[in-house]
A protein has these predicted regions:
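N-terminal glycine-/serine-/threonine-rich beta1-alpha1-beta2 phosphate-ribose binding loop
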Residues: 1-93
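Short acidic, glycine/serine/threonine-rich loops at helix termini
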Residues: 18-19, 49-52, 109-112, 134-141, ...
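Structural motif
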Residues: 8, 75-77, 100, 107, ...
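Positively charged, low-complexity/disordered segments
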Residues: 172-188
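A short hydrophobic/small-residue beta-strand
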Residues: 96-98
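Short glycine-rich anion-binding loops that position phosphate/pyrophosphate groups of nucleotides
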Residues: 44, 78-80, 103, 128, ...
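Rossmann-like NAD(P)H-binding beta-loop-alpha module
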Residues: 119-120, 124-167, 171
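Rossmann-fold NAD(P)-binding glycine/threonine-rich loop
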Residues: 83-89, 102-131, 136-139
Length: 188
């Protein structure tokens, strides 16, 4: 059985996903059962770091979500809209969603989770939090009977970067706010 994947976004993360799907050799056996059926991009003329069949690439993300050959929607376009609307449309169509979009999960995560629960589909977001560490599903499934009172640690790559750099560059003349702003700009 082949599972059709619809990919929303073909930037750095999307191109990486497409590359994995295009060359599953040496990867988990289930990757071979996945087929990239449709890809939506903002700019059809922009050069891409991965070569895909031209007939699967388009600039209409809603068409990717609605395509009956797409079984799972992977959203890596970032930002709040149209990401939120596309995720909700996929859920309404009964399609599981995988997202690496921190912004949409932070702002609309409760709404998305409620829609997914109501429709009975998965929304996987490990790629958006904790540096891709598979922590969300184990917390939801395996530890449901436990009462977790606190999770502590550096669970975000940006936070880790800021803490590491601030330790190296802190001086009495710099305010913490100034340092954080400078480091965030430096990281971009």
């Amino acid at each position: 059985m082949t599972i059709g994947i619809g990919l929303l976004g073909l930037g750095t993360v999307g191109a990486g996903v497409a590359q994995i799907l295009a060359s599953p050799e040496g990867r988990h056996p289930l990757v071979g059962a996945l087929s990239l059926r449709r890809v939506a991009v903002r700019d059809l003329q922009r050069p891409r770091p991965v070569t895909l069949a031209p007939e699967i690439i388009g600039d209409d993300p809603a068409a990717v979500v609605a395509d009956p050959t797409v079984d799972i929607v992977v959203e890596v376009i970032g930002g709040l809209e149209p990401a939120r609307s596309l995720i909700l449309a996929a859920i309404a169509a009964g399609k599981p969603v995988v997202t690496a979009n921190k912004a949409v999960i932070a702002r609309h995560g409760a709404e998305i989770a409620a829609a997914a629960a109501e429709r009975g589909v998965y929304v996987l977001m490990e790629a958006a939090v904790g540096g891709g560490i598979p922590i969300i599903e184990p917390l939801k499934q395996s530890l449901g009977a436990n009462r977790i009172e606190r999770v502590s640690g550096i669970i975000n790559g940006t936070t880790n970067y800021i803490l590491s750099r601030s330790e190296e560059h802190t001086s009495e003349l710099q305010s913490p706010d100034h340092l954080v702003c400078r480091l965030l700009l430096e990281k971009k």
